[in-house]
């Protein structure tokens, strides 16, 4: 009986390791191609992994001199930063309100949030375009920010509310007995305990504009207003020769601010679990 259990356990572990190895190959292989393509001189094949590594920055220079990549990058960075700040602030406040207070139409609005999530972005493109025409908002970053922020609130507010629900109400009640007001209880007691989820929400909000192509390509028509996703795709489509190396260089630069933000926020993923219970 024991041998059978051990054999089953080993088989499960072996299958798990095989799955993880296969998944790692699927993820790492295109990543290696992208990195090596970006630093190689001349054009390269999109499907061939060349082990000869060059440290050549001509592709990065060409990307900035032959395209408006610098402008696209700045556009995207501004949109991402504002979206992250506004969306995260609204989500945190909304999640706290739904978790801690009973107010009119509370349950109905939560259900409405879920219904909104059932409508795919593609189905709303026509409405967004008509709205942009009515507001004269085509080729305007503020309209994209408005859509990104609004689109991320419903589901993320649900997630944030669920995370706030894990914080015991006894902490709020103890702080209230000590004379803490609504804002102080939120800011000093509860918010530090949900910092891991706040960090995740901020990272998601920041990543969205860098990865979005459909919405931005639909609302941005002039090159100087493009985001990096639209700009790179347009450049590759219009190029006489397929310049995979330029595209790879652009992809690496897209990943840089996301990685930097992750390293700045990663300490919050753990520290928030123990940093709020002793404040009041």
Swiss-Prot record:
GO terms for cellular component: plasma membrane. One of its GO terms (biological process) is maltodextrin transmembrane transport. SUPFAM superfamilies: MetI-like. Residues 73-265 form the ABC transmembrane type-1 domain. Its main location: membrane. Keywords: Cell membrane, Membrane, Sugar transport, Transmembrane, Transmembrane helix, Transport. Gene3D superfamilies: MetI-like. GO terms for molecular function: ABC-type maltose transporter activity. It is found in: Cell membrane. The chain crosses the membrane at residues 15-35, 77-97, 110-130, 142-162, 200-220, 244-264. Part of the binding-protein-dependent transport system for maltodextrin; probably responsible for the translocation of the substrate across the membrane. PANTHER family: MALTOSE TRANSPORT SYSTEM PERMEASE-RELATED (PTHR32243), MALTOSE_MALTODEXTRIN TRANSPORT SYSTEM PERMEASE PROTEIN MALG (PTHR32243:SF50). Belongs to the binding-protein-dependent transport system permease family. MalFG subfamily. This is Maltodextrin transport system permease protein MalD. It comes from Streptococcus pneumoniae (strain ATCC BAA-255 / R6).
């Amino acid at each position: 009986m024991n041998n059978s259990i051990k054999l089953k356990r080993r088989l499960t572990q072996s299958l798990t390791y095989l799955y993880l190895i296969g998944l790692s190959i699927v993820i790492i292989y295109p990543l290696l191609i992208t990195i090596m393509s970006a630093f190689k001189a001349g054009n390269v094949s999109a499907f061939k992994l060349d082990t000869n590594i060059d440290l050549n920055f001509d592709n990065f220079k060409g990307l900035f001199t032959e395209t408006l990549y610098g402008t696209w990058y700045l556009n995207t960075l501004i949109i991402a930063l504002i979206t992250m700040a506004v969306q995260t602030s609204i989500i945190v406040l909304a999640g706290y309100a739904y978790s801690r207070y009973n107010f009119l139409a509370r349950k109905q609005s939560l259900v409405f949030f879920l219904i909104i999530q059932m409508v795919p972005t593609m189905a709303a493109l026509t409405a967004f375009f008509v709205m942009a025409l009515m507001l004269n908002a085509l080729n305007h970053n503020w309209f994209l920010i408005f859509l990104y922020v609004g689109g991320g609130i419903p589901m993320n507010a649900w997630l944030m509310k669920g995370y706030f629900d894990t914080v015991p109400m006894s902490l709020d009640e103890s702080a209230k007995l000590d004379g803490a007001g609504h804002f102080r209880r939120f800011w000093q007691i509860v918010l530090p305990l949900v910092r891991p989820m706040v960090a995740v929400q901020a990272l998601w909000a920041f990543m969205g504009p860098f990865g979005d192509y459909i919405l931005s390509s639909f609302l941005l028509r002039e090159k100087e207003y493009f985001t990096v996703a639209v700009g790179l795709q347009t450049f590759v489509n219009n190029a006489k020769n397929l310049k995979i190396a330029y595209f790879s260089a652009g992809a690496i630069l897209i990943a840089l601010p996301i990685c930097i933000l992750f390293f700045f926020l990663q300490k919050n993923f753990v520290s928030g679990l123990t940093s709020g219970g002793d404040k009041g």
